[in-house]
Amino acid sequence: MNAEKTSVAPNVDHAEIAKFEAVASRWWDLEGEFKPLHRINPLRLGYIAERSGGLFGKKVLDVGCGGGILAESMAREGATVTGLDMGAEPLQVARLHALESGIQVDYVQETVEEHAAKHPQQYDVVTCMEMLEHVPDPQSVVHACARLVKPGGQVFFSTINRNGKAWLMAVVGAEYVMKMVPKGTHDVKKFIKPAELLGWVDQTTLKEQHIIGLHYNPLTNTFKLAPGVDVNYMLHTTAKQD
């Protein structure tokens, strides 16, 4: 069964936006608050490119792009990239960094629901990384992503599982013990179980293709993609053909 979900009010948590606005100027500091994003980006990019059959020449939308770490890297692969975010400061940082780097990315400040209403079935690839756990209605985001992708196109989601281990690793460990991200970055109540995400996907034209975990080893201080979705995970889906 295919269903569409449309938000009446903007699907925005202003407190979440404020968190990222406050540290936006340090988005491209490789040793700053966003160091983990810089470190996992090659893994994310590699997974997206491989599962999409390459990004060169493809039209790509990065939902919740922030300061543009993933968006820029996909543009470097030869994609035509649009970055979407509701934070004015992160977008300003993203635009400036792209200009300094000589990389063309079109950054737009609007919700994914608003963008889907204007640009249905316009993208070969849609990415939504570490964003679902920061909005009031993540289901609405999933539905909007499904509307944005072309038939046969690829949609990627990444988020955090909701369980005791995820709370221990992503909140206690990352925020308080190892101080990898600022305190208060995550709210365990907003974490999303894979079954919940897959349930929302099943309500759309998207079909699950692959799911994989993103794992951090504190002993070696390294990240890797591997089976096991008990903390961070990525989901690859494709849009059904007409």
UniProtKB/Swiss-Prot annotation:
The EC number(s) this enzyme carries: 2.1.1.222, 2.1.1.64
Domain of life: Bacteria
GO BP: any one term: methylation
Pathways per UniProt: Cofactor biosynthesis; ubiquinone biosynthesis
KW S-adenosyl-L-methionine (keyword) present: yes
Catalysed transformations (reactions): a 3-demethylubiquinol + S-adenosyl-L-methionine = a ubiquinol + S-adenosyl-L-homocysteine + H(+); a 3-(all-trans-polyprenyl)benzene-1,2-diol + S-adenosyl-L-methionine = a 2-methoxy-6-(all-trans-polyprenyl)phenol + S-adenosyl-L-homocysteine + H(+)
GO molecular function, one term: 2-polyprenyl-6-hydroxyphenol methylase activity
Binding of S-adenosyl-L-methionine, residues: 44, 64, 85, 129
UniProt KW keywords: Methyltransferase, S-adenosyl-L-methionine, Transferase, Ubiquinone biosynthesis
Transmembrane segments: none
Pfam family, one: Methyltransf_23
Function summary: O-methyltransferase that catalyzes the 2 O-methylation steps in the ubiquinone biosynthetic pathway.
Protein family per UniProt: Belongs to the methyltransferase superfamily. UbiG/COQ3 family.
Name of the protein: Ubiquinone biosynthesis O-methyltransferase
Protein's organism: Klebsiella pneumoniae subsp. pneumoniae (strain ATCC 700721 / MGH 78578)
